[in-house]
Design a protein with these regions (language model features):
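Gram-positive cell-envelope targeting signals
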Residues: 1-45, 304
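Active-site-proximal helix/loop segments of hydrolytic enzymes
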Residues: 32, 40-51, 74-268
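Extracellular repeat turn/loop positions enriched in glycine and acidic/polar residues, especially those
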Residues: 57
Length: 307
């Protein structure tokens, strides 16, 4: 795609520096929630009743990121409790929280908690931040191991749909590996080792201007929990006889997946964009305004350029 931008207040002596800085524009591959999805059924088989474990991220001495309006552990607890309250309204679902008090709990213990309850899925609730405070958007981390990769991708796609509805930028459904090829994130690794599908939900970045409006108040954190519950309800096709809500059709309208190998869409694309061109269209030294044109193409994934 092509993006034109104007850089104001540029003096003659700074034009070259401005051009150099512009060349460093970053490219980010992102998950397109409106992708053409073949209506495939949920790959994960379950019994008549579904068991869900919600894990409020961090706790105790592990406070999570401190870059937001409050400690991450406080935000995740509010979100998890709201998610729990919403999910328990549906029929044929048992919902558990790994903890409800502000306590330290190892990742292995969280996964073991889910295993002891024969959980169909463990959802770890989190908020994000970045070193340079310049990243934004929502993402879901899942296992690289099949069939958990496929299960996680189908759920993550549903979660991204909900985040898109809120107006958040979608960073995607992804895997991250250690140097030895194992899953990087402990809660995912420990859950997979116990045969429990899992996903880390990183709702937004608490330290970046685009995302901050989404996570300022306790009501904001509760809203995320309700959206999470809706994602889970749609993924499992839950229903509520009292209200007439029935999401069984949604569980048959998920992305098509393979249980044989890791889904390419969940693998981080580390290659450079195929085309990345920067052109100077105009430089008005009287007004101090420079107009640049950026052309970018990446055949491996959708791409957005930003400065």
């Amino acid at each position: 795609g092509i993006k034109r931008m104007k850089v104001s207040n540029i003096q003659k002596g700074l034009l070259v520096r401005t051009m150099i800085c512009a060349v460093s524009l970053a490219a980010a591959c992102f998950f397109e929630a409106s992708l053409n999805v073949q209506a495939a059924p949920r790959a994960q088989e379950t019994g008549e009743r579904v068991t869900v474990v919600i894990d409020p991220g961090h706790g105790g001495d592990n406070e999570g990121t401190l870059e937001g309006i409050t400690k991450e552990k406080e935000m995740t607890m509010v979100t998890a409790l709201a998610m729990y309250e919403e999910l328990t309204k549906y029929d044929n679902v048992d919902v558990y929280l790994t903890h409800t008090d502000d306590v330290s709990m190892s990742l292995a213990d969280r996964a073991q908690f889910a295993a002891e309850r024969n959980a169909d899925f463990l959802f770890s609730i989190h908020y994000n931040a970045s070193v340079d405070h310049d990243l934004f958007g929502s993402e879901v981390w899942i296992s690289s191991v099949q069939p958990y990769n496929a299960y996680g991708y189908q759920f993550g796609w549903e979660q991204m749909q909900q985040m898109k509805g809120m107006g958040l930028f979608l960073r995607g459904v992804k895997t991250k590996l250690k140097d030895n090829g194992d899953d990087y994130y402990g809660i995912i690794r420990e859950s997979t080792a116990r045969g429990i599908p899992s996903a880390i939900i990183e709702h937004c970045h608490v330290d970046e201007g685009r995302d901050i409006p989404y996570c300022q108040t306790e009501e904001d954190w509760k809203r995320f929990g309700r959206e999470d519950a809706l994602s889970v309800a749609k993924y499992f096709g839950l229903s509520d006889a009292d209200t007439g809500v029935d999401y069984s059709a949604e569980a048959d309208a998920l992305p098509e997946v393979s249980l044989q190998s890791i889904l390419p869409a969940t693998i981080r694309d580390k290659t450079e964009p195929d085309i990345c061109l920067l052109s100077l269209l105009n430089a008005d030294y009287d007004t101090g305004e420079v107009t640049l044109e950026v052309t970018g193409t990446d055949y491996d994934c959708p791409m957005m350029y930003y400065d």
